[in-house]
Amino acid sequence: MAETTKTHVILLACGSFNPITKGHIQMFERARDYLHKTGKFIVIGGIISPVHDSYGKQGLVSSRHRLNMCQLAVQNSDWIRVDPWECYQDTWQTTCSVLEHHRDLMKRVTGCILSNVNTPSVTPVIGQSLNQSTQPVYQNSNLSNKPTAVRILGKVGEGLSRMCCVRPNLQRVTFVDENANLGTVMRYEEIELRILLLCGSDLLESFCIPGLWNESDMEVIVGDFGIVVVPRDSVEPEQIINHSSLLRKYKNNILTVKDDSNHPMAVVSSTKSRLALQHGDGHVVDYLAQPVIDYVLKSQLYINTSG
């Protein structure tokens, strides 16, 4: 399949990341590898979106610490970045609203075609050419001094060269006009870009719990965006899908990562990581990256808590 006809994908993972584990990063890597192997997708970026402090989960440390740990966990990645938008809102945001925020942001910033699974868009957003030196200003009076997500595309097919949080002197994001070329590869209007929710099979299983999720939100998440599921703890996504009429309805929008990996996906568990820290268990190095461990110890996180 030609690169111009492949769907370009940004993987978005929402969660507490309390703390972020090696398994969380493995989920991104495994999902990207699998999607590339299908020949239908090009994963150009990954976004980690930690939950707001008001989520109310026992033992949840402040978003300041969780954002810092996430940044340390991905500091050597050239395609996974941490986005603070969810943490900086006035209150907790639903997964659906986070997905919609990033979809709308990408429309404004990139000029790419962003499509739902079943209703692909045909009208790109019109703005300023990316390769021009002058940058128009996108006004947002609520930005204050908070980090702003800025996305700069490198060569399509090689992924995002940067998706990071900065504190600009001016409140700006770059736009792309309808005639702009993306380097020498293709026109922006020819790129179909989708944001897919990345999760483990445990989150997918929670869709089957009555009353836990808003029905209309589930419809949007699965029906409009789509999900990439990484199996964990021997929970098979296919079995979960068969237990939900809504998941069965949109089963073609649920992509299950199938690979030969022997990664023990249980190490995604932040709970096990916290317990290892509390008990001084040396196996914590199996769960957390060393920079995250160093940060936890320096900040005295989780050591004296039972969350």
Curated annotation (Swiss-Prot):
GO cellular component, one term: axon
GO-annotated molecular function: ATP binding; nicotinamide-nucleotide adenylyltransferase activity; nicotinate-nucleotide adenylyltransferase activity; protein ADP-ribosyltransferase-substrate adaptor activity
Cofactor: how bound: Divalent metal cations. Mg(2+) confers the highest activity.
Cofactor: Mg(2+)
Binding positions for NAD(+) per the UniProt entry: S16, F17, W92, T95, G200, D202, L212, W213, R232
Alphabetical UniProt keywords: ATP-binding, Cell projection, Cytoplasm, Cytoplasmic vesicle, Golgi apparatus, Lipoprotein, Membrane, NAD, Nucleotide-binding, Nucleotidyltransferase, Pyridine nucleotide biosynthesis, Transferase
Bilayer topology term: Lipid-anchor
Annotated binding of ATP, by residue: H24, T271, K272, S273, R274
Record-linked Gene3D superfamilies: HUPs
Gene Ontology BP term (one): NAD biosynthetic process
Catalytic reaction equation(s): beta-nicotinamide D-ribonucleotide + ATP + H(+) = diphosphate + NAD(+); nicotinate beta-D-ribonucleotide + ATP + H(+) = deamido-NAD(+) + diphosphate
InterPro entries in alphabetical order: Cyt_trans-like, Euk_NMN_adenylyltrnsfrase, NMNAT_euk, Rossmann-like_a/b/a_fold
Enzyme Commission identifier(s): 2.7.7.1, 2.7.7.18
Superkingdom of origin organism: Eukaryota
Top-level enzyme category: transferase
Subcellular location: Golgi apparatus membrane; Cytoplasmic vesicle membrane; Cytoplasm; Cell projection, Axon
Main location: Golgi
Pathway listed: Cofactor biosynthesis; NAD(+) biosynthesis; NAD(+) from nicotinamide D-ribonucleotide: step 1/1; Cofactor biosynthesis; NAD(+) biosynthesis; deamido-NAD(+) from nicotinate D-ribonucleotide: step 1/1
Family per record: Belongs to the eukaryotic NMN adenylyltransferase family.
Protein task: Nicotinamide/nicotinate-nucleotide adenylyltransferase that acts as an axon maintenance factor. Axon survival factor required for the maintenance of healthy axons: acts by delaying Wallerian axon degeneration, an evolutionarily conserved process that drives the loss of damaged axons. Catalyzes the formation of NAD(+) from nicotinamide mononucleotide (NMN) and ATP. Can also use the deamidated form; nicotinic acid mononucleotide (NaMN) as substrate but with a lower efficiency. Also catalyzes the reverse reaction, i.e. the pyrophosphorolytic cleavage of NAD(+).
Subunit structure and binding partners: Monomer.
Name the UniProt record assigns to this protein: Nicotinamide/nicotinic acid mononucleotide adenylyltransferase 2
Species of the source: Xenopus tropicalis (Western clawed frog)
